[in-house]
């Protein structure tokens, strides 16, 4: 298989619409198959005020688009920087404006998998920008802040948006971030596990500050996408739920 070279990063925006939750309760969201194919091309120029950092000269076999979504302040940018650079953005909170992305190539069972990870703004005024990027996303990491009950209460609204704008077979995972702030916890783990079970989502708690389960979340997504892309008859089917339950610290498998 010939390998491609990672291009420089770009980002952009386009408008779309929103939707309200269904009155008859949650519709299960099945962790599914990402549509195989080449990486999604950027939709426009970089947003002003933030730099887009690419993968430089890294080579890869296949690329997938992954989006980080959730309310503003839940730690999406910090989670991305922890995974990409192994660092923590301490200090003053700076909210993402519009959308930005970074690339990272990971080795999955001998295959070079490039994850093009899009960091989205959580504020309502940027929501239409986010909608435009759902349609060609292969996977979504939906975050809430365990110290912020309102961010958890917004999860069902985010799931409705995902159902409206994303592919039916998008891979979806729920992450409770900032678990390092145990004394400030406002969302019980049991409540998040119940929500994840209702929607059939894999779930784990993470910390961008300590790195808890951060690599695991992205690695699990990469393994799922790679396995669905190759579809080798002799290769056992990758079980996303079982993998994070086995490998994670404090992770759980939540099936309906």
From Swiss-Prot:
It is a lipid-anchor. A motif (Switch 1) lies at residues 86-101. One of its GO terms (biological process) is Golgi to plasma membrane protein transport. It is found in: Cell membrane. It catalyses: GTP + H2O = GDP + phosphate + H(+). This is Ras-related protein Rab-26. Coiled coil: none annotated. Belongs to the small GTPase superfamily. Rab family. GO terms for cellular component: Golgi cisterna; Golgi membrane; plasma membrane; secretory granule membrane; synaptic vesicle membrane; trans-Golgi network. The gene is RAB26. A lipid is attached at residues 253-254 (S-geranylgeranyl cysteine). Its main location: membrane. Switch 1, switch 2 and the interswitch regions are characteristic of Rab GTPases and mediate the interactions with Rab downstream effectors. The switch regions undergo conformational changes upon nucleotide binding which drive interaction with specific sets of effector proteins, with most effectors only binding to GTP-bound Rab. Residues 1-53 are annotated as: Disordered.
